[in-house]
Amino acid sequence: RDVERSRGLGDVYKRQNYNSAVATFCNNIANDLPIQVNDPSVELELLYIDDLVDEMIHALKGEEHHCEFEGLDVQPKADGRYCYCPVTHKVTLGEIVGLLHQFAEMPKTLMIPEIPADSFAKRLYSTFLSYLPKEKAIFDLKMNVDQRGSFTELVHTLNCGQVSINISKPGVTKGEHWHNTKWEQFIVVSGHGLIQLRKEGTDEVLNYEVSGEKIQSVIMLPGYTHNIINLSDTEELVTVMYCNEIFNPNKPDTYFDKVEK
């Protein structure tokens, strides 16, 4: 009853090109090396090392899970002869490779993959990163620079928009536009600035003075033209900007109109 039968163990310690397809794929894709997949439809049942360790800790506490086996199939049974880990993941070789290519493209696409809590993707991403060569742990971001400062997209998400960082030079005003559906949040993290909003068709201007000394978030409301002004004569204004959608040049939903006429 103290024997634990382990499934294919996926973790950061397996040897690539030796005893694990997952380790081999992670290593080769992380290092831009070729891989070979003879049959993408082949399904593996994988057990992540942390889940195995958690189950072993449960066993030490007398809280192990018991089972019997019918061939290779686990049959949970309270008085079973074997201990087993109930958390495993059935996934095809094609699915594994597809996810790994998404992970590898992230520095180019900025797209954060969907990695729900307790998902196989979350475990695979951590495993993939453990094979990343040290020179790939840092990568450049595309800075859009002009005389006013810079704007740099940091991350994209599939369903929750994007995060960027905006740097404004002293005295500079940026924005002066509004959106129908798109909305944003501006968070000044360094410097001293003024964020202004005005609802289209009205004259009232909302003024929000913000500073890196007190981190606050200001929502750019749909239908409100808005700007951000660096009030300093000497310091740059650094603002983290969240937008609920990724910018689409074919459907920008951006209309220019000064806040103060």
Residue ranges and their predicted role:
Residues 200-222:
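Short acidic-glycine-tyrosine-enriched beta hairpin
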Residues 2-9, 13:
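Single conserved hydrophobic/aromatic residue that forms the stacking wall/gate
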Residues 24-47, 67, 75-85:
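A conserved pocket-lining segment of Rossmann-fold NAD(P)-dependent short-chain dehydrogenase/reductase
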